[in-house]
Amino acid sequence: MKSSVEQQSATRVKLTVEVPFDELQPEIDQAYRSLAQQVTLPGFRKGKVPPRVLEARLGRGAILDQAINNMLPSRYSQAVEEHDLKVLTQPTIDITRLEDNELVEFTAEADVRPEIDLPDFSTIEVEVDPLVADDAAVDAELDNLRARFGTLKAVERPVQKDDFVSIDLSATVGGEPVDEATTEGLSHQVGNGELIEGLDDALEGMKVDESKTFKSNLVAGDHEGEEAEVTVTVKSLKERELPEADDDFAQLASEFDTIGELRESLAKQVEENKKAEQASSIRDKVLEKALEKTDFELPEAVVEEQVKGQLNQLLQQFNGDEKAFDQLLAAQGSSREQFDRDTRSSAEEAVRTQLFLDTLADELQPEVSQQEFTEHIMFTAQRYGMEPQQFMQAIQASDQIGALYADVRRGKALAESICTVSVKDTDGNEIDPKEYFGEEENTDETSTGSADAEASENSEATPSGTETEESAEFDQAAEAPVATPTDDDSENAEK
């Protein structure tokens, strides 16, 4: 077999592969055996039809078609390995030449990982917030716990910040109604700023069944950037009632008997959470600076697949109802156009991050132990709210084992690189990154955390439609449309 590669762009290649017929004989024999099982001829048992009789019945073209499709996966993979290509997508394959009993030539075009020049991490300096785990932080954590056990009750008073309201919204521009900014029975917590500008200010002080009109600039839709008159009507008003922080609450909300014991436990949790936040901040800022120092082209097809994957994942929550999805976006002061722009930006960032980390992992070659891989599976299962065994079955069914292995490998490579970075907090205190990312201290959460999770959360382990080198398998090559010459074509094949 001979192969050559043509670089069509920084992210796409074209392989040309020639396979002599003497190397194709095992696939031809396999084709005869396979087709013999599918053909019933008088006088022959099934599967026992001689090759010459089978060829006379089906034609030489059918035999070659089967043999070539049997051959494609292994020869393509061999060519990819020979040229050390980091293939990201399934190839487009064409049979370009067939000389019966002489050779078969095919081309395969695919997106590949571009060449990436890695920065010197030891030159990177980052600054993060100091580690603060005081009584105020413990109080805030206790309040969060109380809120989980809180109840909503209707109140008869003006709306206040943090209240929960059900509202109707409508808007007009130039006296004409704006359909995409009209909704009824929308639930909203006052003060969270998630809906249109000026709404929270308008709501404060209103009463149930009261309406108010205010002006706001629309940020999306056909009237994006135009000033609209928005009318809001409060349909219901509730406040969250928190339980008292006493021993009874401690017994209700935890395994502790007293509020003092609960606070002590929360203090430890707060400290661990603050450390995790600081580690996450270090990781994210280091990765951001490393990417700023690196410029490379992104494979467009991979980005597009990532965009589609993100959109389909969101639409599943609306049972595929794009109209309902668009209405929600409008109620949030956004639009499909803005969503598409944001999604593409997110997809590009996810693909850029993964390609960079894959290159870093190839450079550093970190070893992933079985224990580390198991811990990552358990950590990821927890993120998705699944039992480890259930999650393992799901990723096996979706062929994502390789993708999860690649996650761990990227995380370890990044952690190793972060250990060489200069880190200080905003008070000027030096922080040794090895405390978080050293081999002994390194945990699954700190090594793979949000830097790699940013990509995986957007793509469910890998960018949609993308295959890393660790997980790629040429399992669809035989299904690729192949223009194999017919029986007549093979007789007149190019000499």
From Swiss-Prot:
It catalyses: [protein]-peptidylproline (omega=180) = [protein]-peptidylproline (omega=0). It comes from the Bacteria. It is found in: Cytoplasm. GO terms for cellular component: cytoplasm. Residues 162-243 form the PPIase FKBP-type domain. Involved in protein export. Acts as a chaperone by maintaining the newly synthesized protein in an open conformation. Functions as a peptidyl-prolyl cis-trans isomerase. Keywords: Cell cycle, Cell division, Chaperone, Cytoplasm, Isomerase, Rotamase. Residues 486-495 have a biased composition (Acidic residues). Consists of 3 domains; the N-terminus binds the ribosome, the middle domain has PPIase activity, while the C-terminus has intrinsic chaperone activity on its own. The keyword Isomerase applies. One of its GO terms (biological process) is cell division. HAMAP family: Trigger_factor_Tig. Its EC number is 5.2.1.8. InterPro entries: PPIase_dom_sf, PPIase_FKBP_dom, Trig_fac, Trigger_fac_C, Trigger_fac_C_sf, Trigger_fac_ribosome-bd_bac, Trigger_fac_ribosome-bd_sf, Trigger_fact/SurA_dom_sf. This is Trigger factor. It comes from Corynebacterium kroppenstedtii (strain DSM 44385 / JCM 11950 / CIP 105744 / CCUG 35717). Belongs to the FKBP-type PPIase family. Tig subfamily. It is an enzyme of class 5 (isomerase). Its main location: cytoplasm. One of its GO terms (molecular function) is ribosome binding. Residues 450-461 have a biased composition (Low complexity). Residues 425-495 are annotated as: Disordered.
